[in-house]
Amino acid sequence: MAVIKFQMQQQQHSNWCWAAVAVSVARHFDPDSTWCQCRLASRMAKREKLNVAGCGTCRKPTGVPKKCNQPWYLQKALRMVKMLKGKPKGAPLSYRKTRQLIKAGRPVCARILWGRGPDAHFVAITGCFKTKSGERWVDVEDPDSGSSTWLHEEFRKNYEYAQGQWVDTYPV
C-alpha cells in the first residue's frame, strides 16, 4: 500500500479544478506556499488578457467577476506555481508507475476527458493498493466531488461512471 498525506482544496468556482489542483500540489510540497486559487486565477486572467481587475483575493474568494471562472490548462497553472517537473504525458500511467511515484511522495495529476470532449476535469491520485485477489485500486482526490477509491482500470476508462477517461498526466 502506498499513500500520500495530501489535502485537496475544494474548487472555489465551477471551472477552477485546475486552480484547486495546482494550489493543492504547491501546498503539498511547501505548506507555507502563498498561492491560493484566486491569486492563481488572477494571474491566468492577466495572462489571457481577460480585461478584469482581478479574480478575488485569498481572503475573499467569493464575488469574483464571471470572466474569472474559466477553464484553463493544468500544465500552465503548475508551471506558474513552479511545480511542473517535466513534460506532460498524453496518456494515463500504468499502475506500476503510479505506485512508484506515490511511494516517492509525488501525487499523480491527471486530466479526465468526459465522453468525446471537449469538457475535461483535473484530479490527483494520492494512493494505491493491491488486494490479495490482485485487484489494483487508486485513491483519487477530486476538487469537485472529494475523495474516492477506484479500480485502476475503471478510473482510467470510466471515472465517475460518466465515461471519464484519463488522457493526460502531469509530472510534479
Model regions and ranges:
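Active-site nucleophile-adjacent alpha helix/oxyanion-hole segment immediately C-terminal to the catalytic cysteine
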Residues: 1-51
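Conserved active-site-adjacent core of cysteine acyl-enzyme catalytic domains
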Residues: 44-172
